């Protein structure tokens, strides 16, 4: 039998592998730093990404980019997530898979709620990969690790035998909830403490109700107080939406009322005016005591994450991962101007500012702009009259750490202070000693004759 197809007919083809290949290619580009147009800094760890991917996966980033109109050279710093949590969130955006420790499930859900990522916000009702010891030939996975896969396309309709539900659809705990002693808390990152901080933020933002969550023995009670209701109808001072945000107001994060959602975004976008706490060692300021304690580990010997190749210690596992790249010796990112090579693309980007006049960090109090964020922070301290770096010998204060170090070397070090008068005095002493030696030699010559 012959088939005749008219030229006017339309034939449709579906590429079932396209979606998977598309994500795989995007993730490879991110890992290599190719075409990345945004850098997100979390706990001093820089993550390169594609702005369109962040905006597509997160309503928070979508609103953020529309609000700020950031360009390709922008660096955004967020301070309401842990770096290891954000790393997993970023991996999920590019792979549709996420691995999360059981003690961090609630924290991951809270992060998903704030970032506006529905899948992470509903982790307890998602499907997870569960492998029993028998299925793995006696080798089970980590006791406190779950690998959660998000179905792609038609794969959502199929279920493998090793996939089971986590919790019920109404977010209430299921009968087969994992029981047992909670995992030990490491590195001071207590899940309870972290959730308490998150609850305080939600209260302050005026959320009328926070869903009751119970995953793996951790519970966050619903919270409804008169104070929070009052806050829900108020807008924080100087933190208001402009007319340009009206078209995106309807894209609320699940679980937030309209007023609370607006306040939440403004809070996360601009921060909250709190009293700053300064580090006694270096003067760096923080908005809460928890972040200060974490920073103070940099000045102590508490560095539990040790490199096996050089025994150098680090305070977080993310910092250790960054350090391990040094030992590979592979530096794929080279400067086109001077040929200097770098391990990471962000380091090359930072170096390239030396050859250009790019100054992305602008002062909001004057017209000056700087190539590095640290220089901007030093400059802003001068505007505010802050001098957090205090000399331990004479209590003289300075705005920059380098000024304090220079002062200590010049005034309080064991070396003699070098001044023009000191140089002249030392020269005169040398000349006098030379003349005395010459006179003594002449006397010895006369005596011998």
From Swiss-Prot:
GO terms for biological process: cardiac septum development; coronary vasculature development; heart valve development; kidney development; negative regulation of DNA-templated transcription; negative regulation of transcription by RNA polymerase II; regulation of cytokine production; regulation of immune system process. GO terms for cellular component: aggresome; cytosol; nucleolus; nucleoplasm; nucleus. A motif (Nuclear localization signal) lies at residues 50-66. A zinc finger (C2H2-type) spans 277-304, 305-332, 333-360, 361-388, 389-417. Signal peptide: none annotated. It comes from the Eukaryota. Transcriptional activator of the dopamine transporter (DAT), binding it's promoter at the consensus sequence 5'-CCTGCACAGTTCACGGA-3'. Binds to 5'-d(GCC)(n)-3' trinucleotide repeats in promoter regions and acts as a repressor of the FMR1 gene. Transcriptional repressor of MYC and thymidine kinase promoters. This is Zinc finger and BTB domain-containing protein 14. It comes from Homo sapiens (Human). The gene is ZBTB14.
């Amino acid at each position: 039998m012959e088939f005749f197809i008219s030229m006017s007919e339309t034939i449709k083809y579906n590429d079932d592998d396209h979606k998977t290949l598309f994500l795989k290619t995007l993730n490879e580009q991110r890992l290599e730093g190719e075409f990345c147009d945004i850098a997100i800094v979390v706990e001093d760890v820089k993550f390169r990404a594609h702005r369109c991917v962040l905006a597509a996966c997160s309503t928070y980033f979508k609103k953020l980019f529309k609000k700020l109109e950031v360009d390709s050279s922008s660096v955004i710093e967020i301070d309401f997530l842990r770096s290891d949590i954000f790393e997993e969130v970023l991996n999920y955006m590019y792979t549709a898979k996420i691995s999360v420790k059981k003690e961090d499930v609630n924290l991951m859900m809270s992060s998903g709620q704030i970032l506006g990522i529905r899948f992470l916000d509903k982790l307890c009702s998602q499907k997870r990969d569960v492998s029993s010891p028998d299925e793995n030939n006696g080798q089970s996975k980590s006791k406190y690790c779950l690998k959660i896969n998000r179905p792609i396309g038609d794969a959502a309709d199929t279920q493998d035998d090793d996939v089971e539900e986590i919790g019920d659809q109404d977010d209430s705990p299921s009968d087969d909830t994992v029981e047992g002693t909670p995992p030990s808390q490491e590195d001071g990152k207590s899940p309870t403490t972290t959730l308490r901080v998150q609850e305080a933020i939600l209260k302050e933002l005026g959320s009328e109700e926070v869903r009751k969550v119970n995953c793996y023995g951790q519970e966050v009670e619903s919270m409804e107080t008169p104070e929070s209701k009052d806050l829900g109808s108020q807008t924080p001072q100087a933190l208001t939406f402009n007319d340009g945000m009206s078209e995106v107001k309807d894209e609320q994060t699940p679980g937030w009322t309209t007023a609370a959602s607006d306040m939440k975004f403004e809070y996360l976008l601009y921060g909250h005016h709190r009293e700053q706490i300064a580090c006694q060692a270096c003067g760096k300021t923080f908005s809460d005591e928890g972040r200060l304690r974490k920073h103070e580990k940099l000045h102590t010997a508490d560095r539990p994450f040790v490199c096996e190749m050089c025994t150098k210690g680090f305070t977080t596992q993310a910092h250790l991962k960054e350090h391990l790249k040094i030992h590979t010796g592979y530096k794929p990112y080279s400067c086109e101007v001077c040929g200097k090579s770098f391990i990471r693309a962000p380091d090359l980007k930072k170096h390239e500012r030396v050859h250009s006049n790019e100054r992305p960090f602008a002062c909001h109090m004057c017209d000056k702009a700087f190539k590095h964020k640290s220089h901007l922070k030093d400059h802003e301290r001068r505007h505010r009259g802050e001098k957090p770096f205090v000399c331990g010998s004479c209590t003289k204060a300075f705005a920059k750490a380098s000024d304090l170090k220079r002062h200590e070397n010049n005034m309080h070090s064991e070396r003699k202070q070098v001044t023009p008068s000191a140089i002249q005095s030392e020269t005169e002493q040398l000349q006098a000693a030379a003349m005395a030696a010459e006179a003594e030699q002449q006397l010895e010559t006369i005596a011998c004759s």
